[in-house]
């Protein structure tokens, strides 16, 4: 699947709100760390199930005191005495898909490391507990929960990527998530415009549809112009990324490496697509 095809899917499902949140968290930030950084054994054990939908994934980065400053997280991973397992302790919050996920991508620091390391943690492991679902203003059909890791033991084979490489994994995956969130919002905007136009045609005041009033026309026009601007930003950035992926592949780099380097190159555009 090309990058822009995945952008189009995010756009189409964006109107669904709750489903698009669950879908995006699973196929994006929960699955891509394994796609890009997992070894062959990890991909066979976990990625196959995530891709088929047999397993559901969640991404555990944010903590009560580390949001945008993600690398300041306090979650810890310590080797046990025979160095066969990591023991993870910590708290994660606002975890999309947290309630029903089977696999968690968890970020923690080993001993006194300065940077995070990524780990694959199965929900079935002992020591995992969670708070009730968050009482959100919207997207109530998606799961958002706090997750606690209390002496959770995982085999050393479940470390994802290199030691202290977790922060890099987190940022690269979030860059992809940002631009796809922008594409997802497009779908929501189009749905809102459709509903607004339909209502303006149905609502009658002074014996005419309110769509004939100048103020309503102006509001609808601004909605359309702003949505078109957002669309232009997202798909221009997506096309630039797609072209760079192709360029890097022609240089002999793998698809995964090409995608990562292209996303890194356009990380600012990814952030703009999300914020705008």
Residue ranges and their predicted role:
Residues 85-130:
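A short core secondary-structure module
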């Amino acid at each position: 699947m090309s990058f822009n095809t995945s952008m189009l899917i995010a756009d189409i499902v964006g109107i669904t709100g709750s489903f698009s949140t669950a879908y995006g968290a699973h196929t994006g930030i929960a699955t891509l760390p394994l796609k890009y950084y997992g070894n062959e054994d990890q991909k066979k054990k976990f990625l196959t199930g995530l891709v088929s939908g047999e397993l559901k994934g969640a991404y555990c980065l944010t903590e009560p005191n580390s949001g945008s400053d993600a690398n300041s997280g306090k979650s810890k991973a310590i080797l046990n005495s025979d160095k066969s397992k990591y023991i993870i302790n910590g708290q994660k919050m606002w975890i999309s898909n947290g309630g029903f996920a089977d696999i968690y991508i968890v970020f923690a620091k080993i001993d006194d490391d300065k940077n995070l390391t990524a780990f694959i943690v199965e929900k079935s492991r002992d020591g995992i507990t969670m708070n009730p679902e968050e009482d959100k203003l919207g997207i109530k059909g998606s799961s958002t929960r706090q997750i606690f890791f209390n002496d959770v033991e995982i085999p050393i084979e479940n470390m994802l990527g290199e030691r202290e490489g977790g922060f890099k994994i987190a940022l690269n995956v979030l860059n992809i998530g940002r631009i796809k969130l922008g594409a997802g919002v497009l779908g929501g905007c189009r749905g809102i415009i459709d509903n607004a136009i339909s209502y303006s045609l149905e609502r009658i005041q002074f014996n005419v549809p309110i769509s004939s009033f100048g103020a309503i026309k102006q509001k609808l026009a601004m909605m359309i112009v702003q949505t078109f601007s957002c669309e232009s930003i997202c798909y221009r950035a997506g096309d630039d990324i797609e072209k760079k992926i192709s360029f890097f592949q022609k240089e002999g780099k793998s698809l995964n490496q090409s995608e990562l380097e292209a996303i890194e190159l356009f990380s600012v555009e990814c952030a703009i697509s999300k914020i705008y």
